[in-house]
A protein has these predicted regions:
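N-terminal membrane topogenic signal
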Residues: 1-17
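Membrane-interface helix-boundary motifs at transmembrane edges
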Residues: 4-6, 53-65, 120-126
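Membrane-interface helix caps and helix-loop-helix hairpins in membrane proteins
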Residues: 30-35, 57-58, 83-93
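Cytoplasmic-side transmembrane-helix entry/capping segments in multi-pass membrane proteins
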Residues: 40-42, 61-72, 95-98
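Alpha-helical transmembrane segments of multi-pass membrane proteins
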Residues: 48-52, 73-78, 135, 139-146, ...
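Short, highly charged, low-complexity non-transmembrane loops/tails of multi-pass membrane proteins
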Residues: 239-260
Length: 262
């Protein structure tokens, strides 16, 4: 209990510090006249409230450790990544966030299926492996839907969410001079765009490599959490690491106690 109380205090302090930094960022963007970034800052403050909203509406207790990871993830994606251009300044920033996203979405999927698993309205009780598999599938589905969103924004609104990738060589059937269905290897040193030569050391892939990389690291994050979830359920909720990361479904008694406290 003391350890959990300490985590809650740390979570609260981190949220206050991050919120203060976001407010300062919003004010700065306002004075700079960058209203798009100002909107992103306001959106960040709203997203900070999502864990508490889910806690109340779904009768799920989000551990302080997991909530802290969520808050840092939101701050890293919107304030550092978008407003401060960490996606450009730090090449692996996007990879880190997509891996974390796979982990977090698996946690949410785990909590959702656990709601059904513990509900008195359902007679079927699912095994730890099925719960973990559902969490994994939920995370991957969210990852795929996000890539659909990135593609749509690029295609219809001229954005660049699916980042470009320099590919130094290709293997292509199309470039085989004999016309045979045999790929040939071609090293690419430069490319020509509208008559202008760009010596980039390769050709410019406009999304497929970035998309596949994002899905692969999302897969890794989802697998890691699913393994943690299996161990947690097989050991009947024991383990400090798992307990600090896995949302807990509140019992009726805990829910009534929580309602009285509010």
């Amino acid at each position: 209990m003391k350890a959990n109380s300490g985590l809650k205090k740390s979570r609260t302090k981190i949220q206050m510090v991050l919120s203060a930094l976001v407010i300062l960022s919003v004010a700065r963007q306002f004075f700079l006249g960058n209203y798009h970034n100002m909107f992103l800052g306001i959106l960040t403050l709203i997203l900070f409230m999502v864990p508490q909203f889910l806690d109340r509406k779904l009768s799920v207790t989000i551990p302080p450790g997991l909530e802290t990871v969520i808050l840092i993830f939101i701050f890293s994606a919107e304030i550092l990544g978008e407003i401060n251009a960490f996606y450009v300044k730090i090449p692996i920033w996007d990879t880190i966030l997509h891996t974390t996203n796979g982990f977090l979405m698996a946690a949410i999927g785990f909590a959702l299926i656990d709601l059904f698993n513990r509900s008195d309205r359902f007679s079927i009780k699912m095994s730890p492996y099925f719960v973990a598999f559902f969490a994994f599938c939920f995370s991957m589905t969210v990852g795929v839907m996000w890539e659909f969103f990135e593609f749509s924004m690029d295609w219809f609104f001229g954005m660049d969410m699916q980042k470009d990738w320099i590919v130094p060589a290709i293997n292509s059937v199309k470039l085989n001079p004999t016309g045979a269905n045999v790929p040939i290897h071609v090293d690419v040193q430069s490319l020509v765009v509208n008559g202008e030569t760009w010596n980039l050391g390769g050709y410019l892939d406009i999304g497929i490599v970035d998309t596949m990389k994002d899905l692969i690291v999302n897969f890794i994050g989802a697998v890691v959490f699913s393994i943690i979830g299996i161990l947690y359920l097989r050991n009947r909720g024991k383990g400090k690491l798992a307990a600090s990361l896995i949302p807990q479904v509140r019992s009726k008694q805990e829910e009534e106690h929580s309602s009285r406290d509010q």
